[in-house]
Amino acid sequence: MTERLFAKCSQVSVVDVRTSMEKLSVQEIVEAVNGELLGGDPDSWLTGVSTDTRSLKPGDLFFALTGEHADGHQYVGRAIEVGARGVVVSKESAVPRCADAVAVKVDDPLWALGELAKYYRSKFDVSVVGITGSVGKTTTKEMVASILGRNWNVLKNTANFNNEIGLPLTLFELNRSHEVVVLEMAMRGLGEIRRLAAIAKPSVGVITNVGISHIERLGSQGSIAEAKGELLAELPPDGRAVLNAEDGYFRIMRNRFRGRVISFGSCKGADVIAAKIKCLAGGRYGFTLLMEDDAIEVKMPVLGYHNVYNALAAAAAAVGMGVDLHTIRDGLENFSPPAMRMELVKSKAGYAVLNDVYNASPASMVAALKTLDALKGYKRKIAVLGNMLELGDYAPKAHRDVGTALMEHRVRMLVTVGPLARRIAQGAKAAGFSEDAIQSYGDSSEAARSLKSQLTRGDVVLVKGSRAIKMEEIVRVLLSD
């Protein structure tokens, strides 16, 4: 009942990814989604799934999803026109009377999408690794996929296909060549991770950490931990839970899980440990990876001390899959970092931009400042920081705390973007940062225009903030000719 309520109440944005699924019969689909066949050939087959008529291909099954800004039922006719062989709807009136396509009625097309993905996933004998956490999910997913890809054919979700729409669409890409699936799982409320895990059926569950991202929606860090911990509740008895030994909720989660726990951290007692962590040339880090009596040196291809912990989480997940340390090392050293995360790009004007604009939370802001501090060979270090969203009542203090943390790192100039980010400036000034070295702007366009004229050869500029404030616009302007 709780899961059903979640599906009905969730606000979604309609997204789509092209699929290469194996064909499904109409009978299979109707039974999997507990639907009613309204019309069409019951003996026909469908060869793909779509939620967007703009990318729909002939033979697809179109799900009419209702989101915050669009109702897929308005596009049912168009879907059939461009070749949909079937449609899944909750409104019978949305199906044109003259349509030859298969029409299936359900209570909730979003829920039905997940149910069909669950059924489709059950047709394959694959191992699934599920990854969640407040920060580090995407990078950890890419690291896990890089490691496991050395031994198996791996399917992973791409872009932002990590929610109740994107994860099912990713599963429809499964085919007989795949041996392992690596899935990032995002959430904005209780019940969502449980739902995603129930669909994907992971045997390895990774929780990178528990922070205060989305605390506006969940109310407390304890509720966030509960939401992340739903992943463990869906693991099988012989499953493996990968947990951060240095996280404040580690003991609670470890004690609640009855299967095998593989812990990671830089502390003694963890199962997978990073020792002798050191900053290498260019701001990248190296460390000794320890597991029981084995040790191996790892040199990270990505900037940031925090990525050592993402690497540990990925290594622990690989250990749970039976992978040896040499393969883990090779996977970590050769993975490709996700876009807009710790990308250091030199401009034609001679200054560098540290692009970390994908998103922002208090923990990731401080991690980015630490990364900026570790960069050597630059004359002036500048932090351009935007709003952090979904922090609720914690927002004022969280932003001020980032400003306070600025004093622990060698930043010469602070630029804030957005009304909330002005609190970062307040925190910095209160901690002793020079008011003359602070600039505040209302939006990213204004900040970009002003900042570019102030940069000189030898500067390095960190740009970071929540996606809604469009910090990528600043990066675009700074790197333009």
Summary of predicted features, one role per range:
Residues 28-31, 96, 111-245, 249-257, ...:
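Phosphate-binding loop of NTP-binding sites
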Residues 30-32, 90-99, 206-352, 379, ...:
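Acidic, Mg2+-coordinating active-site environments of NTP-dependent enzymes
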Residues 212-218, 354, 388-392, 463:
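A short acidic, helix-capping loop that chelates divalent metal ions and anchors anionic groups
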